[in-house]
Amino acid sequence: LKTLNETNQVYIIDIRAAADFTLGHIKNAHNVLLKDILTHIAGVDLTNYTKVAVVCYTGQTAGYATSLLRLMGYQKAFALKWGMSSWNAVFATSWNNAIAAGNAYSTQFVATPTEKAVAGKLPVLSTGFTSGQDILEARVAELLTAGFDPAKVTSAAVFAGLSNYYIVNYWPAAQYTDPGHIPGAIQYTPKESVKLAVDLKTLPTDKPIAVYCYTGQTSAALVAYLRLLGYDAKSVLFGTNGMIYDIMVGKSMTTFKEAEIMGYEYE
C-alpha cells in the first residue's frame, strides 16, 4: 500500500471515526463513513488507480466493507490487512489488546467433529424488488446503513452460549482437527463450502450463525456475503487470535505480531 500510494496508484478510503482519522491517518486517505462508502466510490473516477484500499482499525470492518464493494462490482477494492494496526504501533491498540487476552479458550478447543446440518432452504428476502440487480443494490444499501455492529460477535458471547449459534469453523479440514475447534463448530472449507452447489443450504435460516477464521478478517468478508443473502451471520471478532493465540504461534498459523507493524509515517 505504501508503494502504491507513493506512485499515486491507490485510492484510500479510511472508514474509521472522524476523531481517530484526525489523530492520524495515511497520507492521501479519504475519511468516509461506512454507510456512505458506496455513494462515495461511485463519485470517484478510478481509471488511473490499480487498487482501492479500505482501511479501518483492525482489518475486520474493512473486510466487511470490501466484500460488499466487490459484490457491487468494484473488483479493485481491497482491505488493508490488520487495518491501521499494521501501519504504525500508535494505531495497534485493538490488536495488541486482543492478543494479550488471546489464550482465554486455549483449553476448550476440541477435535471431535460435528456434522453439517441437512441442506434446507435459502433465506427469503423481502426488498420489494424483482430484478437481481435491484435486489442486490437494496440489500447492500441496507447492510451498509446498519453498519458492522449487527454483523459481529465476541468470542466470549459465543462461548457463553454455544448452543445459541450455528458455529462455522472457516478453516481447512486438517486444522479443524488440529489445533481443533470451538465445541460444536462445523467445518466449512474456505472458497468452496459456501457455494450454492456445495454446502450453502446447510446453513440455518432460523438461528444466528457465528463464523470464525484465524483473525476475523476473512470471516467478516464471508459474513457480508451471507448477510446479503439473508442469513443472520456474525463474524467472531479477532478469530482464534483472540482464543488460542499461543497455540497458533506454535503451529505457524496466521497471527498478529510485532513484525506485522510497519512503523510507517502518517499525517
PLM feature segments, named:
Residues 1-4, 144-160:
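A short, well-structured juxtamembrane/interface segment
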Residues 22-51, 63-151, 174-208, 217-267:
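Rhodanese-like catalytic fold shared by cysteine-dependent sulfurtransferases
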Residues 11-16, 29-32, 165-169, 185-188:
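Short hydrophobic beta-strand that contains or immediately precedes a catalytic carboxylate
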Residues 59:
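Aromatic/histidine-rich interaction motifs
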Residues 3-7, 45-48, 158-164, 202-205:
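Flexible, charged surface loops at secondary-structure boundaries
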Residues 55, 212:
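Short, surface-exposed ligand- or partner-binding patches at beta-edge/loop junctions that are enriched
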Residues 17, 172-175:
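Single-residue recognition of alpha-helix capping/boundary positions
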